[in-house]
Amino acid sequence: MKKKELIERLVSEIESGKVKTLGIYGHGASGKSTFAQELYQALDYTTVNLLETDPYITSERHLVVPKQAPDQKVTACLSVAHELASLQRDILALQAGMDVLTIEEPWKASEILSGSKPILIVEGMSVGFLPKELFDKTICFYTNEETELKRRLARDTTVRNGDASFILASQQMRREQYLQYYKETESKADILINQSNNKFQIKTNII
């Protein structure tokens, strides 16, 4: 199944009411944000909220270190880096019909998500650590290390003004933490998609 076909299938399920809350997650630079945006744009914006979870990654994660690698900083591959209780509260509020004011960040202004919209797409790494029962369906993306690094270099240096040397130096640490702490979340997804080498391969398909 190609990406376009999957988006069309999801749009059909969402518009029919079969899927009201969709979780999209995966490691950094796996392609989850691009897919979420494409799906969001294929839907009627007056009926859908897109809740991005990056603002729920705590800025205080530098205060802790991985137990098995105390020389490393904590990346978003560890659950301790996420404000999961706050995120779950906001998801439940939207599902209950209440408005939510999103967290303001330097890269994204705060906005009000309307509880009157019946459809909710939650996108970001945090989704992998949340109870699966919050979602009607979950989709997880991943890539091989080479693809992840290429995407990080392209995105973080141009869009986020990152330093290429830092990205290269931190890549091994990020990948190690992904393999040790985050990869296990992939087994919970209803749909698992491999985007290595910019291909689109569905590995698990429960639709």
Across the structure, where does each feature detected by a protein language model lie?
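Conserved lysine of the Walker
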Residues: 32
